[in-house]
């Protein structure tokens, strides 16, 4: 009876004034159990649906993407935060976070920023890996973050890490093209990587092949060109990047400098309110002897505090003024760059230019002080920095006349440079000055479109300087090769390129060799 009574007690459930018996209890318990299971399973399903990561380039994300690629980092960051609130499962704001980290670290090179921002890349990668792999944006996003991290690693001297990240980026983009052939969103990055890998000399291609990276400069550039000029949804969305990357590749990889600047002009890029495009145009113009154009772009840009403050504005505007022999205008700008820029790139080059400006002004105390700093500050990753250090080690000040001609030529003032040098060859008795004089005249004639005269002076430069460590002979060989290649005289051009490659121990060897190989 005890056992029976216990059972009755356990099964007597009061519902209002009604007493439910064992049979009805069992039925009610069963129904409630089913409801509980259904609720539990429904909750799991609902949670899974809510937790499903998505890639949504909604209006807020598009606006944030546009702002960050104008280098308006603070407004972009606010929009990214807003997008995360709108949909915490959206991975596009996570990707855009990496853009802010990339631009700040790559352009400013501040070690203090590096300490807390660089580790964000790993967190971003981990977050993006939670996305659905059956979406082409999965590989696209990861490939972008890896290449961004690689570029930052290169700037901070972590070359091994950068190499592995470049491979990761390449492999993800390559896999995407095979898996989703209709997806064009990563044509820009994949094409750029293909083009760069395609420039690797044949003697080293075994290494890229071993790493699974095979590329073609021609096919890669074709892919990038099609994307930069494309009209599909991805080409339009990512045009802020393609209009930055494509002209750079045209200029430096293809050596099509006029085409690069023409692209910027034809696309009517906003060089006032988009600082990324303004920086691109100013930099390429400066490197194409159009320093007056550089000066105009920098001085007329939107100076709102919304934009990240780039020290390179001071450096490039200082260079542009120096090339015009505006020494008083150049000095404070170059000084500001060397004092405020936290990175290493172009510091030695800027200090050399600062020393030249003071030297030409007759302020030898300031000139010597700037030269001494070349030994103490900055890196030697760029050819310009290497050359600055090499010339500082010589301990000799350049011939003032040749220096002025050099600066005028670099700035695009060829007529003024020719007027300065013409008929004065006999004034130069030093062998190195004689070599530079012949080279400078060759460059001036080329800039003036007198190619036959230029080639004659380039040949004389090679004859005088082939066995010297100065870069003049190697550069003369490269310039002669480029003139002949444009004329269709390919075999003669190849001969000059081979001469350029054969010359050792000059400061611009890396960049000149790259151009000769291309």
Where would I find each of the regions flagged by the language model?
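Solenoid-like repeat scaffolds
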Residues: 83-88, 179, 209-214, 229-233, ...
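"A position-specific structural signal for the A-helix of alpha-solenoid helical repeats
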Residues: 62, 96, 103, 141, ...
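Alpha-helical repeat scaffolds
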Residues: 79-80, 115-129, 161-172, 212-228, ...
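Alpha-helical adaptor scaffolds
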Residues: 244, 251, 286, 402-412, ...
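Residue-level detector of the short coil/turn that links helix A to helix B
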Residues: 71, 157, 254-255, 289, ...
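Generic helix N-cap/helix-start motif at coil->alpha-helix transitions
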Residues: 54-60, 135-136, 183-184, 202, ...
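Residue-level recognition of tetratricopeptide repeat
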Residues: 65, 99, 144, 151, ...
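Short coil/linker segments at helix-helix boundaries
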Residues: 55-59, 67, 71-79, 97-248, ...
